[in-house]
């Protein structure tokens, strides 16, 4: 069984003409997967492409 860690991902995404800041708590195996999961969530929920998301930090909680 793989241990899942909690990561806090901070950044901003393009919402119309402005950038909106976000902070997300992501359960993931490692930092790279947490980053990919964040891109996936924003693409799914907000219809935002990866190029319109800027991740500023990923920290293990």
From Swiss-Prot:
Stored Gene3D superfamilies: 3.10.20.10
Classification via Pfam families: Ribosomal_L18A
Keywords, in A-Z order: Ribonucleoprotein, Ribosomal protein, RNA-binding, rRNA-binding
GO cellular component: ribonucleoprotein complex; ribosome
Keyword Amino-acid biosynthesis applies: no
One Gene Ontology term from the biological process aspect of the record: translation
An MF annotation (GO) of this entry: large ribosomal subunit rRNA binding
Protein family membership: Belongs to the eukaryotic ribosomal protein eL20 family.
Subunit structure, interactors included: Part of the 50S ribosomal subunit. Binds 23S rRNA.
Name used for this protein in its record: Large ribosomal subunit protein eL20
